[in-house]
Structure formats: structure tokens, C-alpha cells
Amino acid sequence: MSGFVFYIVEDEQLKAAAKACKNALLCYSNYHFAREGGYFEPSAEANPFLHTWSLGVEEQFYFLFPLVAVLAYGRGWLKARYLGGFVLVGLAISCFMTFQYPIRAFFALESRAWELGAGAWLAVAVARGTLPGWLSHRAVAATSLVLLLLSVVLLRNGDLVPAPLAALAVLGAVLFIGGRAGGSGSRLHGIFASVPLRFLGRISYSLYLVHWPLIVFVRSWRGELTPAIAAGLAVGGAHMLWAMLESLPARQAQLARRVWDKRGRA
């Protein structure tokens, strides 16, 4: 992927792309882009590694949170109510940073950790059986979808992101997933379990990896894209990446099980 990116980038942008690539490999690209300027700056939009900023946030969280969770578990602190407190404190910090240091707030772990922490709260609540019963009410699914749609409609070039606007998306996702985990039989959950949406869910990680480099490449070659063409290219590229690379370990494991079963029957 990196070699392909360096092929498509203009000479004057090559240095910026190389620096972003290095920081992405170090799981630090979010802070790199925070130093370089805003997400919506023209120079940033031409960088094929721009999308790696959120991977940096995730990787930093996934490295630090398990360490904290192990320590908390040993002291009996790994409980949903404590994680809920962490999310609320993180949201308050995020609101402060959004208004005082908007560029850093957009990219930084300290202003984004509460979003991932909300998912951790949900996982612990489900595992410990402390999920609120009202989450399984069918009206919760409709409310969650409204919140998710509002978070998209109200987004304007990063205004009030990550807080308080991102709280709509986070709360909507928690309500939707929590409702399904709580046994809700909402029709909305059935729709989202349909084959086309499950397909998008299956390739979602590959979709995130390929969408931005593909868009940068086609823009540099053919100019601006319509949303439909951009989406089609991204989904097609993501499916290829998923089929050739991401699903390979699962296919190998399945093949190994078949070989083992045949030997067991022999």
C-alpha cells in the first residue's frame, strides 16, 4: 500500500507523505497531523495517509487500556460504573479541548479516549450482566438511529468535534449495540443484520484502510469525484483487500481444521 501511495503522490507532496507514513508505522500519526494543521486543510486532504490519524488513536488506546484494565481488575475496579465515570470525565475534557485547542482536540488520544471508553463500558456491562434493562426496549433502536443520523447531518468541517457533537454518534452506537446485546427484537436490528449490511460490516476495516488513498489517487488523475463513484471505488478496493489479505488467516485456519478432521477420521 505504501509503495502504491508513493507512486501516486506528486513530488512536492512526497516529503509530507513520507513523514506521515513514518508516523503511521509508529502509531503516532494523530499527533503528527495535529502538529501539521487541521484535518480539513487543503494540504492535509492531499495526503494519502491522512486517514491513519484515527488508527493512531485506536492503537494508542488498545495499548494503554489493557494495561490499565489488568491493574484495575486486580483491585476490583474494573466495573461498569467506574468506566462510566471515565467516559463522563473524558467527555468533559474533550469539550474543554474542543473549544480551547480545537486542532489538537480533533486528533489527540486524551480528547478521544472517552469514545473508545464507551465501548469498553458496554463490553464490561454485557460481560458482567449489568446492562440496563431499558436498552432492550424497541424505541431505543429508533432513538439510536436518529442520533446517528443527526451526528452526520450536523457535522460541518469539524465544528464542535470531537465534543460535544461526537457524543451523538457515540451515544447512538452504544444504544444500538447495547439494545441488540440486551435482546431487543427491533426491526431495525433485523435490517442491519441483512446480507448487504453484513457485507459492509465484514469489509469495514479494509474499507477504512483503502478509501482515502484511492480517493487521493483518482483525484490526482481524474479530478474531483462524485460521491457515488468514490463509494464504488472504495467498496471495490476494500473487497479485494479483504479477499486477498484480511480473510486469509481465517481461510487458512478453516483449511487446517478440515485437514485435521480428515486425519482424525482416517
Where are these regions (language model features)?
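Internal/C-terminal transmembrane anchor helices
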Residues: 258-266
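Membrane-interface helix/loop caps of multi-pass membrane proteins
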Residues: 1-258
